[in-house]
Amino acid sequence: MGDDVLGRGSRRDQEIVLVDIVDDDDHDDVPAVRRQDSLYVDATRAGGANHRGGQEESWARTLKLAFQCVGILYGDIGTSPLFVYSSTFKDGVRHPDDLLGALSLIIYSFALFTIVKYVFIALRANDDGDGGTFALYTLISRHAKVSLIPNQQAEDELISKYNTGKPQATLRRARWMKELLETNRAVKIWLFLLTILATAMVISDAVLTPAISVLSAVGGLKEKAPNLTTDEIVWITVATLVVLFAIQRFGTDKIGYLFAPIILLWLLLIGCVGIYNTIKFDTGVLRAFNLKYIIDYFRRNKKDGWISLSGILLCFTGTEALFSDLGYFSIRSIQLSFSFGLVPSVLLAYIGQAAYLREHPEHIANTFYRSTPNVMFWPTFILAVAASIIGSQAMISCAFATISHLQTLNCFPRVKILHTSRQYSGQLYIPEVNFLLCVGACLVTIGFKTTVIIGEAHAICVVFVMIITTLLLTIVMLLVWKVSIWYVALFFIVFMSSESIYLSAVLYQFVHGEYVPVAMSVFLMIVMTVWHYVHVKRYEFELEHTVPRDKVKELLERRDIQRVPGVGLFYTDLVQGIPPVFPHLIEKIPSIHSVLIFVSIKHLPIPSVDRSERFIFRHVDKEEYKVFQCVARYGYRDPMEEAKDFVDALTENLQYYIRDVNFYTTGGDQHIFRSTSYASSIAESFASYEKHSGHAVYAEEMLTPAESFSEHTKQLSGRSKHFKQFQVENMNMQKMEKVQQEQQAILREMENGVVYILGESDIVASPHSSLLNKIIVNYIYSFLRKNCRNGEKMLSIPRSQVLKVGIAYEI
């Protein structure tokens, strides 16, 4: 082929060569493309963005974040002392030492699960600062192709935040785990189902947490107004819940600064009351730090002691919200505030209540308020209600964020998502979901009336999510982290065994109330699974029926096809090839806009994508047709822009593409820069994709692996003798004028107007498919689609500029 060696000394001391794009048959040893107008040009230009280095966080900022996260993260876990003892001893305290056994279980369960597992292990398994089971799944998705949607592209790995590290790939167990996840479809499906089960439990928890927290806090009124009936307490709680959910539409931006001081006062209060009760009633409860009392507790109570674990585990509720909201804070700030703020206060509260109950075991049903000194009752009551509302707010916000993330995976029907803060993109409000959560919380409160039964339902959500988190963390340790297999085994055995014991305890009491979160979670899982299943099937159908290249060329060259002024943005899910709805449009309306852009909105398994790396383009066939394919890439936390802002950004990046694609073209032959080592890695990516996804990548879209041109420019700018060899020879005035004319033509057509073309596919089950498939597609999915938001509303597209093209798919 006659490669010309132009220079050595890139950042990896790799050989840089100039490659002629020629037929594959002549050079089988070099991964090359048939077309230069590929998505590669923009991907490499964008991929040159610098990583945000791991800058050391100052202690001033750490302390500030530590203070702020007290209000956001610890409302739920900090209000657990309101109901733990009453949920543990449902039938009263049978033996005084049972309190020591329960306290010992609380201390060591709290330490094991919240401190060891979540604060010092799980927080490190974050996805670029984002936490939660969903983030664990996306972290795994970046290191192994586990997505059920076959839309992976090699260009995605060029994004600066798409950092897989890959030094651990040399480990045999990492390769084994990667191979297992990518080649075994059953494993992919189970991993997906576990993830959506965990997210369904988190959403269900957003119903139960407000119910149990507010009911526990309001229940304290009985101490000062004993004539209040249970029903009256319930209706006061319902009224409080309605107000709580009603104010969600306003967001917490304006009052959020009050959360941290309120929760901090709450923690100081319960800690001080705990010290007071311990000194006044029984300092002997400190013996509970001896593990012997746990053994004695189970010996004495046997089966009843095992069942009581469903109440004990409520002491670490809120840990998943803590993990999920990691994105707003740093790991060090959470570890600092948790270790020196939350842990002492909460443990002192539990110790103090145990000391009080040693003398007043008959007050077990309302331990918290009975153990509070009379002079402190009203301040405690006010802070308890405020803290329970703040803790509930954290879970509601967590549910909104979870559903927003699920939509990016196409696992949830389209719902309206509003951003309640211009400053903080993570503050969301979803009207439909908010209404359903409010109705659910009110019905649970009215139906169960007591915190004991709601606590049993709450417990199953907590333990299910913890077990799934343990499984996902184990995969992360094997696939991503470079830790000893013995540490992985120790982690899995310790946490899976202990959490399974807690799970068995809550499942034993399934009929008492646990069916509520299970029923809600099963319902949500059915909705999410059906939605995702049909989306995957539709994508596979379109991928199998993409319009062949010669057919596209034939359509574009037809003389009866009229080119009308303006720009057409043709939205499609496909990132590869032309969708089958395009020729259907031409048959019905034999005209094409002067500039036609096939736009694919693609969400990547990373939290965010820099704006400079969002768009990648390629020409569809000849340049003079002015038909492009564009992929707009977003992270799962990135909000969608308004239509006008999106078009402006697309136009700007299209101008860059036109400039770059001509800059990379030098004369009659086409050349691009290529890094030899990087070439092999991208070639491997394509081979792996074809092998494991079962879908071939079309030849005209295969990308020539290369380094970012912008990075090479930086490297070579200080080396004049080498830089002269890289100068593009034919970028003369005539070439520059051609580029400017093409750019101006695009701008003129943009001024003529933009039309958004949406393919409205009517999905029906194939007549030869199974009965289950017909029920899923023709009934469940059809119902969900008819009752969710339209595509143009989700994309914020003006209705006056929308053109819908209907087509039927049989799957």
Curated annotation (Swiss-Prot):
Residues 86-102, 210-226, 276-310, 357-375, 456-459, 504-515 are extracellular. The keyword Membrane applies. Residues 1-64, 124-188, 248-254, 332-335, 397-434, 481-482, 537-811 are cytoplasmic. It holds the Pfam family K_trans_C. GO terms for biological process: potassium ion transport. It is a multi-pass membrane protein. One of its GO terms (molecular function) is potassium ion transmembrane transporter activity. Keywords: Ion transport, Membrane, Potassium, Potassium transport, Transmembrane, Transmembrane helix, Transport. The chain crosses the membrane at residues 65-85, 103-123, 189-209, 227-247, 255-275, 311-331, 336-356, 376-396, 435-455, 460-480, 483-503, 516-536. GO terms for cellular component: membrane. The keyword Transport applies. High-affinity potassium transporter. Belongs to the HAK/KUP transporter (TC 2.A.72.3) family. PANTHER family: OSMOTIC STRESS POTASSIUM TRANSPORTER, POTASSIUM TRANSPORTER 27. This is Potassium transporter 27. The gene is HAK27.
